[in-house]
């Protein structure tokens, strides 16, 4: 039996995220089931978790109004649960990216390219990981992952926060997306993106 040792917990209204230790090379779903089961009132093996054709986790009857997701990186696992939303969660390790400017220029939306490449290197690195993590979380919520295209929508800073500024029609209006992001220690960024059902 897998046990869930919770290292952190965050909540925003009907959305919750748990942080757990995670062994590299193992699946996150068994631990996700352990942490979700007591909250959802079912045994871990009874949780109706299935995968969409693109691999996105989803809850079935009788929990259709809830949504789940998880992400792992560098010994950490985040498990997210929300009610009345479609959500995505991402966790990224902050590490040097020698070709960061090339990645931005090649894959990001033109507005993000202009903004990020106009920053000093230290600021660019900080914002790059925040934007990357936010983009992954949003695309996990959407259900297509990064194959959808990182260039098809944009985040922009609003003070010290990020918000969707440009949205491809397939993603819905930019204003329909919400984002929470935070640091986990000095080496990781986390993001939770969601859209109301």
What role is predicted for each listed range?
Residues 1-197:
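Core catalytic alpha/beta fold that binds nucleotide/phospho-ligands
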